[in-house]
Amino acid sequence: MSDDSHLETKVVTDGTTGEKKTISYEPCRVLGSGSFGVVIQAKLVGTPGFIAVKRVLQDKRYKNRELQIMRAISHPNIIKLIAFFHTHNPSKDETHLCLLLEYMPETVFDDMRWYTRRRKSIPNLSIKLYAFQLFRALAYLHSTGVCHRDIKPQNLLVDYKTGILKLCDFGSAKVLVPSEPNVSYICSRYYRAPELVFGATHYTTKIDVWSAACVIAELFIGRPLFPGDSSVEQLVEIIRVLGTPSYHEISVMNPNYVNHSLPNVRPHTLESVMPHNCTKNAMDLLHKMLTYVPSKRISAIEVLTHPFFDELRDPNCMYHCSRDEGTIERHLPPLFNFNLAELSIRPNLNKAILPPHVYESLDVDINNFEPIVVKQADADS
């Protein structure tokens, strides 16, 4: 470590217990920046690894949704909030929120780029690993009432060596209340569900499923599935693959949508745009996720039961990252260490999700347990 003059010492609030404590960290490098603020990598004194520090400007008119939600949730495939603190600049009358977060070395976007630059495809097993962990995180998140609203490759942190994935960036996340409207211009364009493109303000967590499906397709293709440069172009891209939605489908997505003059585009099929390494099971799963009517779109917990993931349920399955030199094989990262809250989401699906060889390692008897009501995140956000 360099000299102590680079250290920043702060009184922070623990992200789990709420207790105050003093920590010191040394900023290392900028990981990302944008309208939201900046994220840096830092070395936390007294620990062997790194953390990420996210600094965002506070709007005094609102509680910070991201902080509220991150304090309310906890999951192996969601980035952990270690601690947080506020800073105030009197001269500018500005307050910033600083989140100290678990650090991961890359994003799914970075991993994809490594392969595409070498004109290679991400191995199917890696796609299955990333997809399973993403939908496991979403199944838990949705069970708490929270919708992420910005699923994209840049918000999926990974360690390609171990295959572990964690969902991050809850800056757009919100507890969805059925009776309350939401903004429709949410989510990065390539990953926006069609009901959002049609301007719906009453939508469900199924928008995350659509976005995640777009990410899975992109992992196979190596580029975005629906790369629209505007809202109209986004709709054209979707119609080009899935065909024109019927008036009934449009009215279900947004009953208030009145402009029924849709682009006249000659449709392809999903099969025609997906590469040869996209298996029959993968194609079937994509079809179940990429449907216009949200209620017909498969849910995140249901996705986990799909045969596409059966290879991961094989106790002899080993993970080999083709980015590694040599032929290092590793055991899969923990995929089935479901806690009681996860087992309680849809108890009737547990045996379709979890392979028999993990039953004994669970904290509960999968054949005889009392499901709990999953704690809902605070909607006052």
From Swiss-Prot:
Similarity comment: Belongs to the protein kinase superfamily. CMGC Ser/Thr protein kinase family. GSK-3 subfamily.
Transferase recorded as keyword: yes
Domain Protein kinase positions: 25-309
GO biological process, one term: signal transduction
Residues annotated as catalytic: D150
UniProt keywords, alphabetically: ATP-binding, Kinase, Nucleotide-binding, Phosphoprotein, Serine/threonine-protein kinase, Transferase
Residues given in the record as ATP binding sites: L31, G32, S33, G34, S35, F36, G37, V38, V39, K54
Listed EC numbers: 2.7.11.1
Catalyzed chemical reaction(s): L-seryl-[protein] + ATP = O-phospho-L-seryl-[protein] + ADP + H(+); L-threonyl-[protein] + ATP = O-phospho-L-threonyl-[protein] + ADP + H(+)
GO molecular function: ATP binding; protein serine kinase activity; protein serine/threonine kinase activity; protein serine/threonine/tyrosine kinase activity
Cellular component terms (Gene Ontology): cytoplasm; cytosol; nucleus
Modified residues (Phosphoserine): S184
Keyword ATP-binding: yes
Signal sequence region: none
SMART domains xref list: S_TKc
Protein name as annotated: Protein kinase gsk31
Post-translational modification Phosphotyrosine, affected residues: Y185
